[in-house]
Amino acid sequence: MDSVPRLNSVFTLVLSGLWHFGLTATNYNCDDPLTSFLSLRAFSSSSDLTGRSSPAQLNWRMGTGGWSPADSNAQQWLQMDLGNRVEITAVATQGRYGSSDWVTSYRLMFSDTGHNWQQYTQEGSIWRFVGNMNANSVVHHKLLNSVRARFVRFVPLEWNPNGKIGMRVEVYGCSYRSDVADFDGWSSLLYRFNQKTMSTLKDVISLKFKSIQRDGVLFHGEGQRGDHITLELQNGRLALYLNLDDSKAQVSSTAPLATLGSLLDDQHWHSVLLERVGKQANFTVDKNTQHFQTKGETDALDIDYELSFGGIPVPSKPGTFLKKNFHGCIENLYYNGVNIIDLAKRRKHQIYSGNVTFSCSEPQTVPITFVNSRSSYLLLTGTPQIDGLSVSFQFRTWNEDGLLLSTELSEGSGTLLLILEGGTLRLLIKKLARHGTEIFTGSGLNDGMWHSVSISARRNRVTLTLDNDAASLPPDTSWLQIYSGNSYYFGGCPDNLTDSQCLNPIKAFQGCMRLIFIDNQPKDLISVQQGSLGSFSDLHIDLCSIKDRCLPNYCEHGGQCAQTWTNFYCNCSDTGYTGATCHDSIYEQSCEVYRHRGKTAEFFYVDSDGSGPLGPLQVFCNITEDKIWMTVQHNNTGLTWVQGSNPEKPYAMTLNYGGSLEQLEALIDGSEHCEQEVTYYCKRSRLLNTPDGVPFTWWIGRSNEKHPYWGGSLPGVQQCGCGLEESCLDIRHFCNCDADTDEWTNDTGYLSFKDHLPVTQIIITDTNRSKSEAAWRIGPLRCYGDRHFWNAVSFSTEASFLHFPTFRVEFSADIFFFFKTTALSGVFLEILGIKDFLRLEMSSPSEVIFAIDVGNGPIDLLVQSPYPLNDNQWHYIRAERNLKETSLQVDNLPQSMREASEEGHFQFQLNSQLFVGGKSSRQKGFFGCIRSLHLNGQNIDLEERAKVTSGVRPGCPGHCSSYGRNCQNGGKCVEKHIGYSCDCTNSPYEGPFCQKEISALFDSDTSVTYMFQEPYSVTKNTNLSSSAIYTDTAPSKEIIMLSFMTAQAPTLLLYLNFSSQNFLAILLSWNGSLQIHYQLSKEESHVFTINTENLANRRVHQVKMSRDGPELSIQMDQQLFSYTFSLESEFQRARSLVLGKVTETLGLDPEVARANTLGFVGCLSSVQYNHITPLKAALRHASISPVTVQRTLTESSCVSMVDSDANAVTTVYSSTDPFGERDEREPLTNAVPSDLAVIGGIIAVVTFISFSVIGIMTHFFYQHKRSHYASQMKEKEYPENVDSSSRNDIDLQNTTRECKQEDFI
């Protein structure tokens, strides 16, 4: 390809850059006064106090001393004609000289023609200028966005309440020159190249346009190999098509790469800038920029022959175009520095033009805006009593509902209503004697586009036409006879009219109308404004103030924007965020926070930056008692085999963690420690080589850097863990695999340098030699500790504070932190701007104030607490401001919220440092602690700044005073350097908050015995001193707690042995009632029976028995019972405690022995005697505790067993099946009549002999089957993909089946 065009394109790009610089440079001196030399005729107004136009230049003192209208109301304005289009950069105002008349606020409007005005906007809203406070001072405003116009209009909004409207004004700027081309919708400009193909690596295309229609092509170019570029108006939005060297892509079939803008058919100027470098491009429309990457295979754009502007002409067919042409004006059209319109005006040979003129023709249409949905209306008159009716107009709106037209017909022919209902047009003709007729047409008409409506009626025929499409007629209109009325109400009805004159079954219309025709005659809306035609209320005439509130989209995190005329709304579904603008994450920032919310181990979504730009990431939170591990899986955690790789053809595997690197980095940076286990199995496959050699294997980390060290080693040291420990197989090497042996070996270790994690890729290059094999495994990313949640500082004096760089925020700001204090008041934080500010403070012990000003005036939100906030307990505060609302939340108290104004300042203007713990003036300082401060999801590291700040200390002790209540069931809160933990040593529960029950499943012969002869505490420290409970002195207090579930009665739950004869037994009797047997001595025995219901009902029941001296209380589930022993009763210390079956039955009480016969079949949980937890000791610390377990004790969950199959709890004794059918109404007894005792004895002897014979036979068959089963187990083969744990599960299930079968026999 010829290189000359490429050089030319680069050269023209440089020229275009100089051209843009030149435009910018001219603005430095664009501040000349523009009204000083205007004639009197240049000024006009809505009305004048003198009845004629008055000069109103700044500092004017003659005559009336400026302009004042005849009446001071919201419909007044002052206008000036500057003669030509100029660039306006500033305005200034004064009051009327020598009077009490001045304007305190106003709006600015501008126009090229004196019609179709446009309001000045700034920060995305219609700007409200601050005016004067007296008649003589000058208030000057520099326009942030300069405007180019010929006509300027000042519209007073507020004025001196003790005077009237009065103004003297000045406009500053400079002359403005431009090249303009007018396209009539049937013509175009062609820019033909000097060579066949123009090939560009970079492009800059800029222009301004104003359009009459919603559709039309602005420019187009294409090449024979598929390159094309097209900029096209589609439904009032600009669509850009751009493709580089892809013959498959066609303009007509592909979707646009970028779409920007909205309502661009408003006949106002809009700017466009396209900048492309290779495949990267920026597309800007009216200061809204979208970055994208082009399609195609190369970096060059190859355009053949020509570029067309205004349309896409068909070759060899003059006057024929592929798409709808542009209808409007284009200004300052530059293509890579070439002024296309200037070439056309000078009739250069490169330009071929159709019917294009070089001055912008302006259609004289006058739009009107219906502002208020309750009171806006327009009344126009027509010719009454004509046989028929004809009305037409155009409208645009965002609202689904509104009255468009209401008119009372003559000759009693009824009332005609045209309504927008749910975005559909509904025509209704109502007569008193009949129900009326209806016509429906269209849908989605609240899309902001202009829609034309025409109603034509003559005799009994009615036609409704929408956008040139006639609606279908109702089936029967023969009864209609329509005669035109005198009054036509558009948009709404006045309050003082009767229903017959104007009907409005729906709210008033909010939107714009234009081109109103009645009886085929156009209506002059300027005459309406001047009061000579019709009447109106709450209208803006000669102005369509429609605004797209969804451009830009202020719904964050992918929220979908919808709007009405006055507001916008965000749909946050499926985004993971909530709030008015989808700003607030619904997920927590770490596993530590989930733990603090009382969650247990499971999968969670973690949003590390909260309301920041990063989305949530799914992790597994393993919430245990010591460390809270957060695990992120990737797509290849299994063992992967590698063969055939060498340095020329390396093996590479990329790991995907289900999230972006930015998400993973935020997660890692917020953790105290992170690690990944890496393993390399090798046989004649080297891993790292020598420390100075080229590594054979390496991995890529977060920064896309190569890391030639392995798990267990340090960053920058090309070694494995065995190299640092000097334990490698070959001392000459620093990795086991580098020994290059013929035997399998491995190098395994943890990578824990956070700045390098996670592992994103592994590369292996030494598996291509003879007998060379390797396999690798990279474990998931695992982290623990939250560096942010417990990040706290203590302010020791009220004069101390921390300062940080300014808080960068545009539209949304949220602040979250915890605090605790004993002070009466204090400022938490403050940040200032020139006028704006943001401050949070505790104004009193029960009040928190969020004070904020973004330019619309200060707002104070107050939350009052019914309890004191200076109680030295942790409280949290969340404050937020967005475009929709401002809110303040303290703890779980009701939120204080205020909606934002529909128009006004949106963007924060904050530039000072962020002050935490006080104000910049060092007043109202905060005394106490602040913790976990987050601004817009970003953590503020308070502790690091406190290390270098006097009067502020890192950390804040005393978490247990606030969070100790989280440690439940006897757990003890323990202070830690970071946060706190719950010590469950003396609790029968476990888990982070001692909430997880410890349960076990008992068979009929299971026995758990705890001996009290040796002191024991459920810790790993066996050297603790003995408790007083182990002395011979009897305890004055005793507490016994347990939960049980069974279907067996009678049964023994717990047996506490004091001596050979004295005991305490908790059991269920034959009828399922609870009995407590208390044998204190040979002479003193007590039996307490609680006969509330049959407790052997497969449900979990709780028993709590508490004795304080002679007072005994027993709580059975929710019922409480009290007993009192005699004062002479003597209590002894316990020697042993048995759960389940008591194996040493000698001397056992007969009733207890009967309950013990069948043992206990069921589930026990949360067993505690004083601070001893025998079941916990048996399941968790059997090796260091004085506990003995006989037969099978299976850890389980009583609650889950209730929810699942209750038959899991069973017994082998079918004659007393605890789950058998039983009439609970029938009393049970163990009394046996004496005359049947002998017969029973004989039967028992015969039965015993029979069962002995059966038992011998059963034993024989069982041994035979057992040997057969063992041989089966030896021959059993497992699939290769079944791991050892799965094999154990299979074997366990098979064994259980065999045991059940034998038990049944």
From Swiss-Prot:
Q: Which gene encodes it?
A: Cntnap5c
The segments annotated as topological domain Extracellular are 25-1235
- Where is the protein localized? Membrane
List each coiled-coil range. Answer: none
- Any one cellular component term from GO for this entry? membrane
Q: List the signal peptide residues.
A: 1-24
Give all residue intervals belonging to the Fibrinogen C-terminal domain. Answer: 584-790
Name this polypeptide is given: Contactin-associated protein like 5-3
For this chain, the annotated S-S bridges are 329-360, 512-544, 550-561, 555-570, 572-582, 929-956, 960-973, 967-982, 984-994, 1163-1198
Q: The EGF-like domain covers which part of the protein?
A: 546-583, 957-995
Every copy of the F5/8 type C domain together lies at 25-174
Tell me, what does this protein do in biology?
A: May play a role in the correct development and proper functioning of the peripheral and central nervous system and be involved in cell adhesion and intercellular communication.
